[in-house]
């Protein structure tokens, strides 16, 4: 599941935990 795939963007909590999608 990519956060930069149009799902919350890099502002999502999952992104902060896996900040490597952006």
UniProtKB/Swiss-Prot annotation:
Q: In this UniProt entry, which cysteines form S-S bonds? A: 3-15, 4-21, 10-22
Expression across tissues is: Expressed by the venom duct.
The protein's superkingdom reads Eukaryota
Which PROSITE patterns did the record assign?
MU_CONOTOXIN
InterPro entries cross-referenced by the UniProt entry: Conotoxin_mu-typ
Q: What is its main location?
A: secreted
Localization terms from the record: Secreted
Q: What does UniProt give as GO cellular component?
A: extracellular region
One Gene Ontology molecular-function label: sodium channel inhibitor activity
Carrying Cysteine amide, the residues are: 22
Q: Keywords of this protein's UniProt record, alphabetized?
A: Amidation, Disulfide bond, Ion channel impairing toxin, Neurotoxin, Secreted, Toxin, Voltage-gated sodium channel impairing toxin
State the family it belongs to: Belongs to the conotoxin M superfamily.
| Cited function | Mu-conotoxins block voltage-gated sodium channels (Nav). This toxin potently inhibits hNav1.4/SCN4A (IC(50)=15.11 nM). It also displays lower activities on other human subtypes (Nav1.1/SCN1A; IC(50)=132 nM, Nav1.2/SCN2A; IC(50)=363.8, Nav1.3/SCN3A; IC(50)=89.4, Nav1.6/SCN3A; IC(50)=124.9, Nav1.7/SCN7A; IC(50)=152.2). At Nav1.7/SCN9A, it does not elicit change in channel voltage-dependence of fast inactivation or activation, suggesting it acts as a pore blocker. Interestingly, it blocks current inhibition in an irreversible manner (tested during 35 minutes).
Q: Give the domain section of the comments.
A: The cysteine framework is III (CC-C-C-CC).
Q: What else is known?
A: Negative results: does not show activity on hNav1.5/SCN5A and hNav1.8/SCN10A (tested at 1 uM).
Q: What is this protein called?
A: Mu-conotoxin SxIIIC
* UniProt source species: Conus striolatus (Cone snail)
